[in-house]
Amino acid sequence: MKFNRLLKLNEQITTHAIIENIQQKGRNYILTLKSIHLDSNSKETGTSEWSLFIRAEDSKLEKSNQQKDPKPKPKPKAPSEASTKQIIFSQDFHVPDGVTYKYAEASGDRNKIHIDPEYAKKAGLDGVIVHGLCTMAMAIEQITDNHLGGFPGTIKEVGLRFSSPVWPTDDLTVQGWKAEDEENSLLFEVNRSGGDTKVIKSGRLKFENEQHIGF
């Protein structure tokens, strides 16, 4: 996500998305989208790029005609990226109960896995899960308020990967360290507190300058 400016309260934003690529990965697909976000004067407020993993459902005929693949050997667990770096900030935060309903109204994303417990269970989940962008927003808020001097306008670009579902009432921890390959950039990840489950990984935040940086 790249940000040209801060958005105003109650501002009307229109998003146009185009498909840039569809890549097959096994029986599944990776869909790459690029979105442009425009204000009411058709001026660009920012852009975003998305990689979506789409699971393909195998037909009964295909399953009956193919042999099962041998069970793959488990890969050794890679160390947390943060564990190999010098942590310069670590901040805990709580995911409020009911946040999915508020975020659904604010964002317009009313996918039932976020607001309908029974539907979420039919989809194989234990209950409603938090929107990925909602989790991202809460994590970036912690970074901004506690480590960027409370100046969101200094953020110019954010990239990350959603790696595990987040549930209402979860306690999370965001950790960050300076990027060695780029100035005015920091890396971060978000873990479920008290465990080693990463819910956001490969996070990178680029900011305008270090004038207001609090570390």
Give the positions of each predicted feature.
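Hot-dog-fold acyl-thioester-processing enzymes
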Residues: 59-62, 79-152
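HotDog/MaoC-like acyl-thioester-processing domains
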Residues: 3-91, 166-169, 173-215
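Catalytic-pocket segment enriched in acidic/His residues
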Residues: 118-184, 190-197, 212-215
